[in-house]
């Protein structure tokens, strides 16, 4: 018999000296009439012991702290051996919560346990966005979190409806996922399973063999993220009219059309020599460099005390640098920089194939373009979650919670633990091709480029640039979508900018449009780490390095659980 599954949520107090759950809610996934809303954590945990089901909280890192705190204070201890009256967790070294597995004992050989998962790992969006994007027949509401609610507080009709909506939105969304066969712990795992189902597990294991941990560690040194760069020419200055374009499904489009590695790599010494059987390669290289005039910098060096980790470099400084580079990255660097004192050390070479992901991407692109609501959003999730799964870190050493003397949770690093890599070379080359796509387009617009962010280019002026004029389309895979045209803008740093965007009213909503069609402008604030509350205080006049405001919630572990303390946010 399959286990029942429930969507759950807590509402909690906001005082450091009175941290507790004042309301809980649970609703059965696939049976929305089976739900309950109550006001006692003890009552909820009694139900958890009796139900022995799979529960989902949206952002388990927050709600899970109250559960683990309760378990510790009621005699349960952490253990990964499945002993009675113990609990196990999956919490990453970065503090991401994935699971709590509470074992109550055994009936014969059958384990009596309740497993709690994080629905945010399957649906990585706020509840309000899930309701909107999935076109669910209810929307997330609002309540005043700071209202006094003493122990035994009687839940008001408004609070009851708010909690019920929250758990129902997630219950409906997860039910849709599960009915599509998407039943893994994370969106990435769902996507990888879907790809294996199309390719077949047998062929997957042959095409993407397991590499040794030492080899994976070396190859992983060539793995880099998206290209995010602000042109110094426009930094901290108000800019006039401009345009923003972004690539439709950047990573899936590279997976669809670019030559990508497969099979076991071959190690080579020195400089890579052309090999038609193994045309893709990762080169370990030591060199000095100087940016050419009129070129965008593309070299970024992390975990090095001589360089800022988020800065793209114009020169190598006083000493040569050593990098692991795909042939895609290396060719781009050779075009953008003068290289000196080059030493080719060694590397890995790979067979190549185009179209490995064609059937998978065709399937989900069709759903994305022909469906609306939930199915469309699930298709986007499947398309965008796969590439990163290939480069999953095999080091899965986690954190273990424990109860400190003051009653709050502490965390220690657990025993070292590793899993098999998936196939890191694939993640390395997909991201390399993605950077190549964005950088090549930006470089062709060198006289206009303001800013790049992974899949987007921001340009001065209102003319479509020559390099993309024939590949502009709002939906086609790999084409550039014209996202917006702005009247004015100001960029301070990566992921920190504001724009007045030209808009017009369509069916009662403001839609981006050209300057000629515009009836007004919409003020847009993009700033990593800034809450919506603080964004409402931003203007063109005060948006600058040093801008400071209260309104950033900072989680603090206290006796009983977690309190979100109001703290200062500053643009640095």
From Swiss-Prot:
Residues 227-572 are annotated as: Initiation, polymerization and pyrophosphorolytic activities. The record marks 9, 11, 62, 119-120 as: Essential for 3'-5' exonucleolysis. One of its GO terms (molecular function) is nucleotide binding. Mg(2+) 2 binds at residues 246-247, 453, 455. Its EC number is 2.7.7.7, 3.1.11.-. Residues 223-226 are annotated as: DNA-binding. Residues 1-222 are annotated as: 3'-5' exonuclease and strand displacement activities. It catalyses: DNA(n) + a 2'-deoxyribonucleoside 5'-triphosphate = DNA(n+1) + diphosphate. The keyword Magnesium applies. The record marks 90 as: Involved in binding template-primer structures. Mg(2+) 1 binds at residues 142, 166. InterPro entries: DNA-dir_DNA_pol_B, DNA-dir_DNA_pol_B_CS, DNA-dir_DNA_pol_B_mt/vir, DNA-dir_DNA_polB_phi29_vir, DNA/RNA_pol_sf, DNA_pol_palm_dom_sf, RNaseH-like_sf, RNaseH_sf. The keyword Nuclease applies. 5-methyl-UTP binds at residues 251, 368, 380, 455. The N-terminus contains the 3'-5' exonuclease activity and strand displacement ability. The C-terminus contains the protein-primed initiation, DNA polymerization and pyrophosphorolytic activities. Polymerase responsible for protein-primed viral DNA replication by strand displacement with high processivity and fidelity. Interacts with the primer terminal protein; this interaction allows the initiation of TP-primed DNA replication at both viral DNA ends. Interacts with DNA. This is DNA polymerase. It comes from Bacillus phage M2 (Bacteriophage M2).
């Amino acid at each position: 018999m399959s286990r029942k599954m429930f969507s759950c949520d807590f509402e909690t107090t906001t005082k450091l000296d009175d941290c507790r759950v004042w309301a809980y809610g649970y609703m059965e996934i696939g049976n929305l009439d089976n739900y309950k809303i109550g006001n006692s954590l003890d009552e909820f945990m009694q139900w958890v012991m009796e139900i022995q089901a799979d529960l989902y909280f949206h952002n388990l890192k927050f709600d899970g702290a109250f559960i683990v705190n309760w378990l510790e204070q009621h005699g349960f201890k952490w253990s990964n051996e499945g002993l009675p009256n113990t609990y196990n967790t999956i919490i990453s070294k970065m503090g991401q919560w994935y699971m709590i597995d509470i074992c109550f004992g055994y009936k014969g050989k059958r384990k009596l346990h309740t497993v709690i998962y994080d629905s945010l790992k399957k649906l990585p969006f706020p509840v309000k966005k899930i309701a909107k994007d999935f076109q669910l027949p209810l929307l997330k509401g609002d309540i005043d979190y700071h209202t006094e609610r003493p122990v035994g507080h009687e839940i008001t009709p408004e609070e009851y409806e708010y909690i019920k909506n929250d758990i129902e939105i997630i219950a409906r969304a997860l039910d849709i996922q599960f009915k599509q066969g998407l039943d893994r712990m994370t969106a990435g795992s769902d996507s990888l399973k879907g790809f294996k189902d199309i390719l077949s597990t047998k062929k997957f294991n042959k095409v993407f063999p397991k590499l040794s941990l030492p080899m994976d560690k070396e190859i992983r040194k060539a793995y880099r993220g998206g290209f995010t760069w602000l042109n110094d020419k426009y930094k901290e200055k108000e800019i006039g009219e401009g345009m923003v374009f972004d690539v439709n499904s950047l990573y899936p489009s590279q997976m669809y059309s670019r030559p990508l590695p497969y099979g076991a790599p071959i190690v080579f010494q020195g400089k890579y020599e052309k090999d038609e059987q193994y045309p893709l390669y990762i080169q370990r290289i030591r060199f000095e460099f100087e940016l050419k005039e009129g070129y965008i910098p593309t070299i970024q060096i992390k975990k090095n005390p001589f360089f800022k980790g988020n800065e793209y470099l114009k020169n190598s400084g006083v000493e040569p640098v050593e990098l692991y580079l795909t042939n895609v990255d290396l060719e781009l660097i050779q075009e953008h920089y003068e290289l000196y004192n080059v030493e080719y050390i060694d590397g890995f070479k790979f067979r190549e194939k185009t179209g490995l992901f064609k059937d998978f991407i065709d399937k989900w692109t069709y759903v994305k373009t022909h469906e609306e609501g939930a199915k469309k959003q699930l298709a986007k999730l499947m398309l965008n979650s796969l590439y990163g799964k290939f480069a999953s870190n095999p080091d899965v050493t986690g954190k273990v919670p424990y109860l400190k003397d003051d009653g709050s949770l502490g965390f220690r690093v657990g025993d070292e633990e590793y899993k098999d890599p998936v196939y890191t070379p694939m993640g390395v080359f997909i991201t390399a091709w993605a950077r190549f796509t964005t950088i090549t387009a930006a470089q062709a617009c060198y006289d206009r480029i303001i800013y790049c962010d992974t899949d987007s280019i921001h340009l001065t002026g209102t003319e479509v640039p020559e390099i993309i004029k024939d590949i502009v389309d709002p939906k086609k895979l790999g084409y550039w979508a014209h996202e917006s045209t702005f009247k004015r803008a100001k960029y301070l740093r990566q992921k920190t900018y504001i724009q007045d965007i030209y808009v017009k009213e369509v069916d009662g909503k403001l839609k981006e449009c050209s300057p000629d069609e515009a009836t007004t402008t919409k003020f847009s604030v993009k700033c990593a780490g800034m809450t919506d509350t603080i964004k409402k205080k931003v203007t063109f006049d005060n948006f600058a390095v040093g801008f400071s405001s209260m309104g950033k919630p900072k989680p603090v572990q206290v006796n009983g659980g977690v309190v979100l303390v109001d703290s200062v946010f500053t643009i640095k």
